[in-house]
């Protein structure tokens, strides 16, 4: 796991044909069973909700969340969730994706920083996320929705993301 994916850690060659990931200072090996890690990782705007809520047991889904926020930012030239504190960040996420319930994310209310006094935003499907995605077609919205799923185990994997219909017809040699 990289644990600090953000635009400034992505290096693109001058011709725009190669992407390299930089700054592995927070990276850790990932294995099963899941290990306990610090929750003080990832730059705020790209931090997954489980990390914001204090989980110390997490997996590669935190990087996929970051990929989703970067994907949005590349297309829209602004961060998807622009919080100014950890609580502000989780509120921005919940306002857009809805406050989770036990049905949508089992065990979320047991996370150390989750407060049942947090506002309860109810969102129908991905309507607010869809409204924010003015520069994506349906496939782009679908990919983003799967990347920034609140429930970590339901986020799309890197392998599945590369096979997503959004990339159908993509030819790297034509970039």
Feature locations, PLM:
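C-terminal lobe substrate-recognition/regulatory segment of protein kinase catalytic domains
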Residues: 99-146
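Regulatory extensions flanking the kinase catalytic core
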Residues: 153-175
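Conserved activation segment of eukaryotic-like protein kinases, specifically the C-terminal portion
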Residues: 37-51
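Conserved end of the kinase activation segment
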Residues: 51-62
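Catalytic-loop of the protein kinase fold
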Residues: 1-13
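Pre-DFG segment of protein kinase catalytic domains
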Residues: 20-23
């Amino acid at each position: 796991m990289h644990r600090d994916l953000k635009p400034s850690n992505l290096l693109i060659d001058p011709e725009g044909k190669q992407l390299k990931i930089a700054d592995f200072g927070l990276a850790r090996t990932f294995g099963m069973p899941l290990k306990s890690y610090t929750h003080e990782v990832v730059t705020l705007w790209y931090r997954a909700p489980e990390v914001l809520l204090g989980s110390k047991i997490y997996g590669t889904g935190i990087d996929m969340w970051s990929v989703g926020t970067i994907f949005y930012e590349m297309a829209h030239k602004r961060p998807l969730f622009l919080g100014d504190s950890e609580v502000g960040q989780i509120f921005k996420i919940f306002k857009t994706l809805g406050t989770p319930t036990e049905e949508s994310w089992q065990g979320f209310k047991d996370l150390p920083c989750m407060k049942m006094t947090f506002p309860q935003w109810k969102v129908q499907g991905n309507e607010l996320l869809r409204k924010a995605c003015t520069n994506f077609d349906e496939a782009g919205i679908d990919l983003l929705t799967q990347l920034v799923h609140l429930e970590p185990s339901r986020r799309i994997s890197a392998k599945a993301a590369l096979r997503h219909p959004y990339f159908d017809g993509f030819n790297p040699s034509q970039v």
